A protein has these predicted regions:
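Non-DNA-binding regulatory cores of transcription-related proteins
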Residues: 93-100, 106-125
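Active-site catalytic microenvironments for nucleophilic, acid-base chemistry
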Residues: 39, 64, 68, 92, ...
Length: 157
């Protein structure tokens, strides 16, 4: 089992509606997506299941990276989810062998830290790939993951 975790790209500070859920990507976020597109094309398998929060910033991150080349499933419950909710979501994907989850801090970083057994702080556009050789989606637990890739966008702020 491989779990890829991606924090959404850089966003504008405020949305036109005043709602956090509606914040869109900033120009630097678009540049980060171009960088991530190259990286993810190299580290993700063809059959990767892609799940994303339905917030505007995660939706835009996913769509900029994958265009319409991959199926992306969006879920309201992934918006600002904590580690435990993310773990439950992943464990319910019994058929998956490889997952990419696009989400938010602090939950996405907490999940990465839990699986890898060390502190991982994903900045905007941050990505980590964690491998669980010989483990199924229902067997994932603390500190058993092996970090295969850890990327921080060169366009950070």
């Amino acid at each position: 089992m491989i779990v890829h975790l991606l924090r959404h790209a850089k966003t504008e500070v405020f949305s036109n509606t005043g709602k956090d859920f509606d914040r869109k990507l900033a120009p630097k976020g678009h540049q980060q997506c171009l960088e991530l597109k190259v990286l993810l094309s190299k580290v993700m398998g063809e059959e990767t299941n892609i799940f994303s929060s339905s917030a505007r910033r995660t939706r835009e991150t996913a769509q900029f990276i994958f265009d319409e080349q991959k199926e992306i499933l969006f879920f309201d419950e992934l918006y600002l989810s904590g580690k435990n909710d993310l773990m439950t979501f992943i464990s319910n994907r019994e058929e998956a062998k490889e997952i990419l989850m696009i989400g938010h801090n602090f939950g996405i970083s907490e999940l990465a830290s839990y699986y890898a057994g060390k502190q991982i702080l994903l900045k905007t556009g941050g990505f980590v790939s964690i491998d669980f050789p010989d483990f199924s989606v229902n067997e994932l637990s603390a500190s058993i993951g092996i970090i295969k890739a850890n990327h921080r966008c060169t366009i950070d702020y």
